[in-house]
Amino acid sequence: VLPQLAEQNAKIKTLTVEIPSLESVLAQNPDFVPAQLPLLLGPESKVARREDLATVGVNSYVSPGVCATKKATGDMYGSRQKLWDMTWLYQEISDFSRIFNVEDRGQALIADFKKREADLRQEFGKSKKDLSFVFWFSSASPSADAYVGGKNSASGFIASVLGGHNAITSETEWPTVSWESIIAANPDVIVVASL
């Protein structure tokens, strides 16, 4: 949590660190339930379908960026055939700012992100080398396969903004790959996420 958001974050009740039950969500008497993943609020959800919430008078929202993925067997995030881009984030910011009647703030945030992206592209676009990146998010153990950002994921987008490409070629949004595969890809940069 960013230091400037720590105080606000401390006021938010955590229902679970994984997947909440529908009962635990409804016990909060929500007016609105957003979700990033269809797994949490979709047709095959482990929590509820949007129709279930509508039946009890609760409005809901599912992130449009994740909804754009194609379902892949055994992967809750699916696969993405086209490189993720900021359009998805801008749509979500615009939607939330409209829902919460703060459209001016939403548009200001979008403008700030667009400027920051343009500045990064200008700075890193000068590079003469097409750097290859691997974005490592976690592993079950130090010797286990790596959970990484897939070719067309947001990680692939970040690599493109930095003037390079994702060394992982899988279209799966968040594939698990062997360290041998990573070594064979011979990335110039390995980004280690702190989750």
Q: Where are these predicted regions, by residue range?
A:
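Structural recognition of the beta-strand scaffold that forms the well-ordered cores
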Residues: 32-36, 60-63, 131-137, 157, ...
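A ligand-binding cleft/hinge motif common to bilobed small-molecule-binding domains
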Residues: 40-52, 194-195
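Short, structured coil segments at secondary-structure junctions
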Residues: 8, 55-57, 162-163
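Acidic/histidine-enriched, beta-strand-rich ligand/metal-binding domains
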Residues: 11, 169-181, 185, 189-195
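Extracytoplasmic substrate-binding proteins
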Residues: 49-142
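A short, structured surface patch at a secondary-structure boundary
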Residues: 1-43, 170
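Alpha-helical, coiled-coil/dimerization segments enriched in small aliphatic residues
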Residues: 147-174
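Short hydrophobic/charged patches on amphipathic alpha-helices used for structural packing
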Residues: 22-26, 156, 179-180
